[in-house]
Amino acid sequence: MLEQMGQAAKAASYQMALLSSREKNRVLEKIADYLEANAEEILLANEQDLLEARRSGLSEALLDRLALNPQRLHAIANDVRQVCQLADPVGQVIDGGLLESGLRIERRRVPLGVVGVIYEARPNVTVDVASLCLKTGNAAILRGGKETWRTNAATVKVIQKALEECGLPAAAVQAIESPDRALVSEMLRMDKYIDMLIPRGGAGLHKLCREQSTIPVITGGIGVCHIFVDETAEFAPALNIITNAKTQRPSTCNTVETLLVHEAIAERFLPELSRAMHERGVTLHADARALALLSGGPATAVAVKPEAFDDEWLSLDLNVKLVAGIDEAIAHIREHGTQHSDAILTRTLRHADRFVNEVDSSAVYVNASTRFTDGGQFGLGAEVAVSTQKLHARGPMGLEALTTYKWIGYGDDTIRA
């Protein structure tokens, strides 16, 4: 089955690569319209997925991530329309010039070809990834989580209908509908057809892809994010930033998980932190010194387990650790961070510069929330993932990250001397 899907996707990718921006936008507009026109079918499939998910005992937080309603589906359709408004990077000349040999050379952006995406739980990812791949002239093979396989199948059916209405191959967007996990391992070895693989899920999925894939893999999305509160930080704005970074959407990968506090301000700062976190229902997991200062406060405070510094909470829980200064803060982030998003709150420019230069994460912030690590917030439009590695793409992956480039030489019967 996957062999046939790969062959069809590769053939479709050649056709998609030749489309003009206008032709691609026409497809996207039709997809957005069809999502709304076929809302009843998609929402019915989602209801069936939710019913089965409840029977299997999924938490309410996960059920909310799975759920669609007319408003959410309308928002997803509008997201597709927003992709239409983004500048098309395909065909852009990155650089080039006339060489001494007389050859005119240019480096031009082109589609990757076939993009494979393995993801869990979120039905909106199906449309997000498909729209970004189509905008960049790529084909896509999608493998969503078993929790939303009916929703994904119904959504892809609508996308394929829109493609065919525009005279394009339905195979430009395909979904692996079977929940059989053995198919994931098979997909990881489809380097003959898939040019880049993007896993969007937990640490286990990323580890599986890194270890077993014969396809280049873009990993990321695991966010053990830190905020270091320096001794010169102003308390009121610092608490506002921490509250935003922890409580705005606790289940996201750019949510802060560990707070590092300079020991010189701990006695004054931690009681205020306790009050702020209590108002939002946050449980504090503190090291011994921090726990002693937090124990009399209103927020629930417990002793932190050592392994908690290496894991995402993705909930209203926050690690708190006291550090002697910026050196210890940077050392902790290097040992426990995932190179996603880390921030310093300080009024000392020298410390801000050191943090920016020495913390090796895909996004580093000074006096700002880690929640900004997002394609839309960065002005990239939509994103296909957040990469925490260094090759090909890093940070929020917008349209450019779904392209590569080729060198093109124009000669006048030119030969090499």
From Swiss-Prot:
Write out the annotated subcellular location. Answer: Cytoplasm
Against Gene3D superfamilies, the record matches this protein to: Aldehyde Dehydrogenase, Chain A, domain 1, Aldehyde Dehydrogenase, Chain A, domain 2
Q: Name one GO biological process term.
A: L-proline biosynthetic process
Q: What class of enzyme is it?
A: oxidoreductase
Q: Which cysteines link up through disulfide bonds?
A: none
Q: Which Gene Ontology cellular component annotation is one that this UniProt entry carries?
A: cytoplasm
E.C. number: 1.2.1.41
- Assign the protein's first listed, main location to one coarse class: cytoplasm
Q: In which pathway does it act?
A: Amino-acid biosynthesis; L-proline biosynthesis; L-glutamate 5-semialdehyde from L-glutamate: step 2/2
Cited InterPro entries = Ald_DH/histidinol_DH, Ald_DH_C, Ald_DH_N, Aldehyde_DH_dom, G-glutamylP_reductase_CS, Glu-5-SA_DH, GPR_dom
- State one Pfam family annotation: Aldedh
An example of a GO molecular function for this protein is: glutamate-5-semialdehyde dehydrogenase activity
Question: Is Hydrolase set as a keyword in this record?
Answer: no
Function, as annotated = Catalyzes the NADPH-dependent reduction of L-glutamate 5-phosphate into L-glutamate 5-semialdehyde and phosphate. The product spontaneously undergoes cyclization to form 1-pyrroline-5-carboxylate.
Q: Which family does it belong to?
A: Belongs to the gamma-glutamyl phosphate reductase family.
What name is this protein filed under?
Answer: Gamma-glutamyl phosphate reductase
